Amino acid sequence: MQIIPAIDLKDNKCVRLSEGKDETSVVFNKEPKEQALYFQEIGCKKLHIVDLDAAFGRPSINFNSIVKIRKSISIPIQLGGGIRSATDAEKYFDTGIDNLIIGSMSVNQPDEVLKLANKHNNKIYISLDIKDDDIMIKGWKEKSKLKILDLLNLYKHTPLRGCVITDIKNDGMLKGLNTDFVKKIVSKIESSNMNNDIRIILAGGLTNYNDLINLKKLNLK
């Protein structure tokens, strides 16, 4: 199990949202590059970045901050938020981002995501942003018509890096991990017969050391 710290970017600042709601943002660091350097200096092996403005339909605002972060640290970076086309994806790969996390596009344009995943072998994660058993898209504002298993089955033979699973109701709430949610979603992934090497990244609700202990007890890889 690996712990991956996250930086959520809004207006070129590090923020925390509650349940992914745009209007709830709280700034905790005005210097994203410094936050990224801090995570690297304390020994983190990878960094997770979410471009919230892009996710909410405001692209390009944080692009320069993302480039600065990439240039300032040597650890791998995975990036999500607002990647809605192959052009968007290639733009980030060109900056040196190691892995991309694709949500809405994986639902609405699966053929394009399949092409990207085959071109960039083992570099694409699909994002399952879940609320009340529904996959949410477009900045978590719309319900997808696809159910969880439907989406997983679309990609089960694709050379993905993995799945990023977010418990939206728990995200940013600092209430602790919902292990029942985790068990249910992981069970769905297993029943979809996806590649055994698929990586599962969990987000939403991880608050303290006890959450990590409880997660470890689930024996996830």
Model-based region annotation:
Residues I3-L9, L47-I49, I77-G81, L100-I102, ...:
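Hydrophobic faces of well-ordered beta-strands that scaffold small-molecule active sites
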Residues F28-Q40, S85-E90, K143-L154:
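Short, acidic/polar
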Residues Y38-E41, K68, K91, K115, ...:
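Well-formed, non-transmembrane alpha-helical positions, independent of function
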Residues N12-V15, E19-E23, I97-D171:
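Conserved anion-binding
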Residues I73, I77-N99, D180-N193, R199-K221:
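Catalytic cores of alpha/beta
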Residues K68, L146-I201:
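Active-site/ligand-binding-proximal alpha/beta "capping" segment
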